[in-house]
Amino acid sequence: RFRPGPAWDQARPPAAQSGMAEHGANLGRLRREGRIQLGARYGDTGLVVFRAPDEAAVRAHLAADPTLSSGVFTAEIDAFAPFYHGSTRL
Protein backbone atom coordinates (compact mmCIF):
# COMPACT_ATOMS: atom_id res chain seq x y z
CA ARG A 1 0.00 0.00 0.00
CA PHE A 2 1.17 3.49 -0.83
CA ARG A 3 0.20 6.21 1.63
CA PRO A 4 1.19 9.87 1.96
CA GLY A 5 4.54 10.13 3.71
CA PRO A 6 6.27 12.84 5.74
CA ALA A 7 7.27 14.79 2.60
CA TRP A 8 3.69 14.92 1.24
CA ASP A 9 2.79 18.58 0.69
CA GLN A 10 -0.80 19.11 1.85
CA ALA A 11 -0.95 22.38 -0.10
CA ARG A 12 -0.40 20.63 -3.45
CA PRO A 13 -2.74 18.28 -5.33
CA PRO A 14 -1.53 14.70 -5.82
CA ALA A 15 -0.39 15.25 -9.42
CA ALA A 16 1.79 18.18 -8.30
CA GLN A 17 3.65 16.27 -5.60
CA SER A 18 7.40 15.97 -6.05
CA GLY A 19 8.37 12.94 -8.13
CA MET A 20 4.85 12.02 -9.26
CA ALA A 21 5.74 11.95 -12.96
CA GLU A 22 8.60 9.55 -12.21
CA HIS A 23 6.33 7.52 -9.90
CA GLY A 24 3.81 7.13 -12.73
CA ALA A 25 6.56 6.25 -15.20
CA ASN A 26 7.93 3.60 -12.85
CA LEU A 27 4.50 2.02 -12.36
CA GLY A 28 3.93 2.15 -16.12
CA ARG A 29 7.21 0.35 -16.75
CA LEU A 30 6.33 -2.33 -14.19
CA ARG A 31 2.90 -2.79 -15.85
CA ARG A 32 4.46 -3.16 -19.30
CA GLU A 33 6.89 -5.73 -17.90
CA GLY A 34 3.95 -7.72 -16.47
CA ARG A 35 5.07 -7.19 -12.87
CA ILE A 36 1.85 -5.49 -11.73
CA GLN A 37 -1.35 -7.52 -11.61
CA LEU A 38 -3.68 -4.85 -10.26
CA GLY A 39 -3.60 -1.25 -9.08
CA ALA A 40 -6.28 0.85 -7.37
CA ARG A 41 -6.81 3.94 -5.23
CA TYR A 42 -9.13 4.26 -2.27
CA GLY A 43 -9.15 7.35 -0.10
CA ASP A 44 -5.57 8.52 0.29
CA THR A 45 -4.22 4.98 -0.22
CA GLY A 46 -2.92 3.35 -3.39
CA LEU A 47 -2.91 -0.42 -3.69
CA VAL A 48 -0.62 -2.28 -6.08
CA VAL A 49 -0.66 -6.07 -6.40
CA PHE A 50 2.69 -7.21 -7.76
CA ARG A 51 3.50 -10.45 -9.52
CA ALA A 52 6.66 -11.42 -7.70
CA PRO A 53 8.25 -14.60 -6.37
CA ASP A 54 8.88 -13.13 -2.91
CA GLU A 55 8.98 -10.01 -0.77
CA ALA A 56 12.58 -9.26 -1.78
CA ALA A 57 11.47 -8.89 -5.40
CA VAL A 58 8.69 -6.49 -4.39
CA ARG A 59 11.17 -4.46 -2.33
CA ALA A 60 13.46 -4.26 -5.38
CA HIS A 61 10.58 -2.90 -7.50
CA LEU A 62 9.75 -0.33 -4.83
CA ALA A 63 13.38 0.76 -4.47
CA ALA A 64 13.19 2.30 -7.95
CA ASP A 65 10.33 4.62 -6.97
CA PRO A 66 11.55 8.17 -6.21
CA THR A 67 8.43 9.07 -4.23
CA LEU A 68 9.36 6.42 -1.67
CA SER A 69 13.01 7.40 -1.34
CA SER A 70 12.01 11.07 -0.96
CA GLY A 71 9.28 10.38 1.62
CA VAL A 72 6.38 11.64 -0.50
CA PHE A 73 4.89 8.17 -0.06
CA THR A 74 5.43 5.35 2.38
CA ALA A 75 4.81 1.75 1.40
CA GLU A 76 3.62 -1.29 3.30
CA ILE A 77 4.00 -4.80 1.92
CA ASP A 78 1.48 -7.52 2.71
CA ALA A 79 1.44 -11.05 1.35
CA PHE A 80 -1.55 -11.64 -0.94
CA ALA A 81 -2.79 -15.21 -1.31
CA PRO A 82 -6.10 -15.29 -3.22
CA PHE A 83 -8.54 -18.06 -2.44
CA TYR A 84 -11.27 -16.84 -4.81
CA HIS A 85 -10.24 -15.56 -8.22
CA GLY A 86 -13.49 -14.07 -9.46
CA SER A 87 -12.82 -12.38 -12.78
CA THR A 88 -9.19 -11.45 -12.02
CA ARG A 89 -6.86 -14.40 -12.40
CA LEU A 90 -3.59 -14.03 -10.51
Q: Which sequence ranges carry the predicted segments?
A:
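Conserved, structured core segments of small domains
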Residues: R1-L90
